[in-house]
Design a protein with these regions (language model features):
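N-terminal catalytic or cofactor-binding beta/alpha core of small enzyme domains
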Residues: 1-144, 155-160, 164-168, 186-196, ...
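An accessory alpha-helical subdomain
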Residues: 171, 175-180
Length: 230
């Protein structure tokens, strides 16, 4: 019998200026919802400490469990809409983490690519959020802090899982706006339902990917992940 799909949902703990991270609350709200479409899926919630020295822990989790899809949540206090990040860049800003420590260098992975595009169709997901009444947009700038760094690490792991398949597992980062993480005109419940829709879409994409044998290419009906030049 085939193993159930493994899905990872991540959020962040507190960091300087944000004592209660809204992404953590949103992730908990999301997983409290009943979702018949993913009732057979094994979902892991990981609250990531907002620390540069904790990134190896994320790597270890990704490499050990080999997730079929990853949904990462983070907070962006200055944004007004839910932002779906189309890429992660291999660069960091010299800003202290929750422990007061600074990043070890100016690049996340010194020998890595300059940028990696999301392996999920972010633009299509933005459209679905808007249809649900959520203020949402696509973004090419996930920042140069730990949100972007975690995204880059998750995308590197996903590309390492591609093996003989044409596509890597879907990985998507969502930035939640403002201090509350809830966009104007939306309730916490409404946001949780919208994030649930994203999760269901990622699961569907993972099912299609796993149904393809080695070397089989994407169906013409499969949305192509958004390309994002470096």
């Amino acid at each position: 019998m085939a193993r159930p799909l493994r899905i990872l949902v991540t959020a962040f703990g507190p960091f300087p200026g944000v004592p209660l991270n809204p992404s953590q609350r949103a992730a908990i709200d999301l997983l409290r919802l009943r979702r018949p479409a993913v009732s057979d899926v094994e979902i892991t919630l990981e609250i990531l400490p907002t620390r540069w020295d904790e990134l190896p822990r994320l790597d270890a989790l990704l490499n050990r469990r080999r997730f079929d899809a990853v949904l990462l949540l983070g907070a962006a206090a200055r944004r007004q809409q839910v932002c779906l990040e189309t890429r992660a860049v291999n660069a960091v800003r010299d800003f202290p983490d929750a422990a007061g420590r600074h990043p070890p260098g100016r690049r996340i992975m010194p020998q890595g690519l300059d940028a990696l595009a999301s392996t999920a169709p972010a633009l299509a997901r933005v459209a679905s959020l808007r249809r649900a009444g959520i203020m949402a947009s696509a973004s090419r700038d996930a920042g140069r802090y730990l949100c972007n760094a975690a995204y880059f690490h998750a995308l590197v792991a996903a590309h390492g899982q591609a093996w003989g398949k044409d596509v890597a597992p879907p990985v998507l980062f969502v930035h939640l706006p403002g201090r509350s993480g809830v966009p104007r005109g939306t309730s916490r419940t409404g946001l949780a339902r919208a994030l649930s829709g994203l999760l269901v879409a990622l699961v569907a994409q993972a099912r299609r990917r796993n149904a393809c044998g080695p070397g089989l290419r994407r169906s013409a009906r499969e949305p192509r992940p958004d390309t994002a030049p470096a």
